[in-house]
Amino acid sequence: MQSDNGNAIGPYQIWEIYWKDAVEFNPSLRKNHTYEDCTNKEYAEQIVLAYWQRYATEKRIGRPVTKEDRARIHNGGPNGYKKKATLKYWKKVQKEL
């Protein structure tokens, strides 16, 4: 599955720069894998978790991390939790929770 104008792949719509951030944080995720493996749901979930472990932290945000923070970081990058542009995505996620 490819979307976001062809820039993102897989069930979690992961961009290559997102993948690079995650595997830089957790190099074990790069072993025997490439970006294209983000089309695999289980691998993509590991990438998302590593990305959150890197950016969705209480130390970084300055308060306990919420589901909203995680969703908005996933959608808008490391500072996505601050961006107005990610609120629409959060509303979509809320409907699925």
Each language-model region and where it sits:
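Short acidic-hydrophobic sequence patches enriched in Asp/Glu that either
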Residues: 85
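Short glycine- and hydrophobic/aromatic-rich loop-to-beta-strand nucleating segment
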Residues: 12-14
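Alpha-helical segment that forms one wall of the substrate-binding/catalytic cleft
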Residues: 16-82, 90-97
